[in-house]
């Protein structure tokens, strides 16, 4: 059971994040220390340096040979289920005022519902409840986030950005359609069929170009290199006992240790540019909270039952899914300008209700 001392440790882990965010907000809104270009530069530094190095640090310090296959499968199944649910909802519900089309909303929903703040808030809260076993499980979940889900998230961001750019394939397809409509009465049936085949081929070529463009962007992203090198080094370290040279290790820690603080500072800078703290509006804020604290845990319960997780592993998997949204997806959303106002609202208010929400799920699991 959680004691008052444990609650103090949770608050101690949360308050510094709000301090960083508040400093960012005050420095931009009231002190006018940063221009919009400088704010964008700070966010880019976090996205291109701090987060990749933090990912490397987390992955390289985890033993890949002791990870739970059932936990990995359950985590993968949860992400798959949430994509299916979001895709089904978007077939019938078309949000207004958003960017990126349906793919953009799937990316945002995925960021909110199943990428929690496991490292900063999950460790103190769940370790207080379940001890060292919970810490070991959470370390594996953090590694999965950094190694798999952030990489996939970046690919989806790049794919969405590539789709938004005008392509020659799209222009050809549009021209072909206009000509077909103008001359439809004068063309024989065979020529119509040939043009339809040409249009389909043009669409296929356009899709391949978009995928290749997104892939090229992904493979030059620093986070891709950081995660790949991290898992290779973790394998060498835990199999052969190799250690990083001290100067390299300290250089990585120097930059990565401030990553989350800089991310929260960037969040504060973004808030300062908005007219309201609830930048996305009350309705969207409520939907965000439902995605985070209802849909995410519910789908983790379903996947945990399917994979047959048991005992502490089952409970920790569900409780970590009920943790508030992580700040890293906000950094990516701001970098790609895809609904950062929605994700920032999820981060801010999610951290405020983190402890009571987690305790509510804890008591439900003990019934």
Curated annotation (Swiss-Prot):
Q: What is the effect of changing residue 120 to Y?
A: Strongly reduced auxin (IAA) transport activity
Anything known on activity regulation? Auxin efflux carrier activity is competitively inhibited by naptalamate (N-1-naphthylphthalamic acid, NPA).
Keywords, sorted A to Z:
Auxin signaling pathway, Cell membrane, Endoplasmic reticulum, Membrane, Transmembrane, Transmembrane helix, Transport
Q: Which stretches are tagged as biased composition: Acidic residues?
A: 178-194
Task: State the superkingdom.
Answer: Eukaryota
Q: Which GO terms describe its molecular function?
A: auxin efflux transmembrane transporter activity; identical protein binding; protein homodimerization activity
Per the record, which residues fall in region Disordered? 168-194
List residues in topological domain: Cytoplasmic.
28-38, 91-105, 158-227, 273-288, 334-344
Q: What is this protein called?
A: Auxin efflux carrier component 8
Which organism does this record belong to?
Arabidopsis thaliana
Q: What gene is it encoded by? A: PIN8
